[in-house]
From Swiss-Prot:
Pathway: Purine metabolism; IMP biosynthesis via de novo pathway; 5-amino-1-(5-phospho-D-ribosyl)imidazole-4-carboxamide from 5-amino-1-(5-phospho-D-ribosyl)imidazole-4-carboxylate: step 1/2. This is Phosphoribosylaminoimidazole-succinocarboxamide synthase. It comes from Chromobacterium violaceum (strain ATCC 12472 / DSM 30191 / JCM 1249 / CCUG 213 / NBRC 12614 / NCIMB 9131 / NCTC 9757 / MK). One of its GO terms (cellular component) is cytoplasm. Its EC number is 6.3.2.6. It holds the Pfam family SAICAR_synt. Keywords: ATP-binding, Ligase, Nucleotide-binding, Purine biosynthesis. One of its GO terms (biological process) is 'de novo' IMP biosynthetic process. It catalyses: 5-amino-1-(5-phospho-D-ribosyl)imidazole-4-carboxylate + L-aspartate + ATP = (2S)-2-[5-amino-1-(5-phospho-beta-D-ribosyl)imidazole-4-carboxamido]succinate + ADP + phosphate + 2 H(+). PANTHER family: PHOSPHORIBOSYLAMINOIMIDAZOLE-SUCCINOCARBOXAMIDE SYNTHASE (PTHR43700:SF1). It is an enzyme of class 6 (ligase). The gene is purC.
Length: 284
């Protein structure tokens, strides 16, 4: 990218400065697993993520405003940079980030299931006894985590810790908005044969202090999507996401420290196909 200055490089997205109110966000084909960025890209992943996020930003715009400005990426870069933005970039508002990851869980899986088995609760929220892996929770729960730097692990925190970080009023607003976003999206996804097990939202505040959804929305990177037709509580359903790569890495004996081993092309292509299937199912 020659026409704009890079201001940040995340696990998946690169940010470039347009002016003091707007930035260009490019979704790359990078994949991170276990908080390590893999060397091998997933074909067309950035385009698929961008299409899924844009679909949800539009669908959920009545629940909460989002970071999109409505400007076209093609209008803010030089002609030579057009191939880098095609289908994978958005022009976004520059917001003051809320420094927590807003995780909502509707089902018991992943780190939530691990924690429940140890303590009967998740992030300090007590749950009924006797739940099985992948069980639907009585109601969706807000289980925030800290926002870690690239390469560090996000840490689950209690709601009280969340209040200590951002203040009681904003913490409650983030929680209520995140749960409403999850419920609205999960209801729609169910009509498309997809269960949204859990998801992670990121929020910012605009110049007026308005809570705004940013970064990405309900993608296979930020969410666990399960096919409804093969859902069976008591086992971990196959998901439309990077589980293929994670399973391959687990089986490889890798110690989860950088650098990660090279992931075979067929595993990466299967992962890309899963991402594409999620887009097709959701957006039809």
């Amino acid at each position: 990218m020659t026409s704009l200055k890079k201001i940040y490089s995340g696990k998946v997205r690169d940010l470039y400065e347009i002016d003091d109110q707007r930035m260009l966000m490019i979704a790359t084909d990078r994949l991170s697993a276990f908080d390590v960025i893999l060397d091998d890209p997933i074909p067309a992943k950035g385009q698929i993520l961008t299409a899924i996020s844009n679909f949800w930003f539009d669908k959920l715009k009545d629940v909460v405003p989002n970071h999109l400005t409505g400007d076209q990426p093609e209008d803010v870069v030089a002609a030579a940079d057009l191939p880098q933005v095609e289908g994978r970039a958005v022009v976004a508002k520059r917001l003051k980030a809320v420094p927590i990851e807003a995780v909502v869980r509707g089902y018991l899986a992943g780190s939530g299931w691990k924690e429940y088995r140890q303590s009967g609760s998740v992030c300090g929220i007590a749950l009924p006894a006797g739940l099985k892996e992948a069980d639907k929770l009585p109601e969706p729960i807000f289980t925030p985590s800290t926002k870690a730097a690239v390469g560090d692990h996000d840490e689950n925190i209690s709601f009280a810790q969340c209040e200590a970080i951002v203040g009681a009023e904003l913490a409650a607003k983030v929680r209520d908005t995140a749960i409403l976003l999850y419920q609205t999206a999960a209801e729609y996804a169910a009509t498309r044969g997809i269960i949204i097990c859990d998801t992670k939202f990121e929020f910012g505040l605009d110049e007026n202090g308005t809570l705004t959804l940013m970064d990405e929305a309900l993608t296979p990177d930020s969410s666990r999507f399960w096919p409804a037709d093969s859902y069976q509580p008591g086992s971990n359903p196959p998901s439309f996401d990077k589980q293929f790569v994670r399973d391959w890495l687990e089986a490889s004996g890798w110690n989860k420290q950088a650098p990660a081993p090279a992931v075979p092309l067929d595993v990466r292509e299967k992962t890309a196909a899963k991402y594409r299937e999620a887009l097709e199912k959701l957006a039809g």
